[in-house]
């Protein structure tokens, strides 16, 4: 990870790559977001509700990882939700696509450098909690990320954060309260629970789902947790909503497909869009984002 530069300076390749991507962004876009939003599988249509001022395809950023998954278009959207300046990832990259974990979280780190203070994560997941049903929305209260490598492994990038970051409140409790209140006021049913990230791309076996339940997980997916680790390292305020696209293997007798995930996301889209939009507006009212 370390390379020697002229004059004897040592620079982390991962940090240099991040800064190269940031320099490329600065040449193309002058927009400064306050909130960063990541749209999960099948949820990309939310970007149509943003008052767009600019777009940047991932392929236009030299060295930037690009998504290969159906339902993940692969571009940054810059614009406004209400009057709140946001940057939206329309499509994310996943560890199972073969990228190094540092590349998987590079888009998150870049949004922090752009100016975003809040990270709003979304995903489509499998329900483990038997009280859940396909189409439910779950507020992520905590996570289990030990089944994928930590993006903090390797020499610490001191410019981004401390070597041993605290993880006692990854998902900001104040943001959780704002989202729960927003859901209640707008009559949007909202579950809450723990999200666990496994590597994918294969869906989980029934035995693995039983293991996840024993560990305390309510929903399982193939993204998000590693992104939250990287964002927490950079001291971002993090919140997350998981769309329960299907019940996990062993809970339902039916085989799981990616098409099912996308169809469930389509069904929940109106509630999802309303909750995300109103939550972002309320977050901006209650959290000082322009300081």
Name each model-derived stretch.
Residues 1-10:
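Short, Lys/Arg-enriched N-terminal segments with co-localized hydrophobic residues
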Residues 11-167:
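Metabolite-binding pocket within alpha/beta catalytic cores that recognizes anionic/polar moieties
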Residues 24, 28, 174, 178-188, ...:
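Generic non-transmembrane alpha-helical segments
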Residues 111-115, 213, 232:
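Non-catalytic positions within long, well-ordered alpha-helices that form the structural scaffold/packing
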Residues 176, 182-218, 283-284:
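Active-site/ligand-binding-proximal alpha/beta "capping" segment
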Residues 249-291:
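His/Asp/Glu-rich mid-to-C-terminal helical/loop segments that flank catalytic regions of hydrolases
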């Amino acid at each position: 990870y370390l390379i020697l530069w002229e004059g004897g300076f040592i620079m982390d390749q991962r940090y240099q790559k991040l800064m190269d991507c940031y320099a490329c962004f600065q040449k193309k876009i002058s927009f400064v977001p306050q909130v960063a939003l990541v749209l999960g599988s099948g949820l990309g249509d939310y970007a149509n509700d943003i008052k767009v001022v600019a777009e940047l395809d991932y392929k236009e950023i030299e060295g930037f990882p690009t998504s290969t998954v159906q339902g993940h278009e692969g571009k940054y959207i810059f614009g406004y939700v209400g009057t709140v300046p946001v940057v939206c990832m329309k499509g994310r990259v996943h560890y199972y696509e073969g990228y190094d974990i540092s590349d998987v979280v590079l888009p998150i780190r870049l949004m922090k450098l752009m100016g975003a203070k809040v990270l709003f994560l979304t995903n489509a997941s499998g329900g483990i909690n038997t009280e859940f049903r396909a189409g439910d929305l779950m507020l992520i209260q905590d996570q289990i990320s030990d089944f994928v490598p930590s993006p903090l492994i390797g020499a610490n990038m001191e410019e981004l954060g401390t070597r041993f970051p605290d993880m006692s409140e990854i998902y900001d409790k104040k943001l959780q309260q704002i989202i729960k209140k927003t859901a209640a006021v707008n009559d949007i049913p909202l579950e809450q629970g723990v999200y666990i990230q496994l590597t994918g791309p294969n869906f989980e076996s029934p035995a693995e789902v039983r293991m996840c339940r024993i560990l305390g997980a309510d929903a399982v997916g193939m993204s998000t947790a590693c992104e939250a680790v990287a964002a927490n390292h950079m001291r971002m305020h993090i919140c997350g909503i998981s769309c329960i696209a299907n019940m996990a293997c062993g809970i339902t007798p039916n085989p799981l497909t990616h098409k099912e995930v996308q169809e469930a996301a389509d069904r929940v889209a109106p509630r999802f869009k309303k909750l995300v939009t109103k939550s972002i507006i309320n977050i901006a009212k209650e959290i000082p984002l322009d300081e």
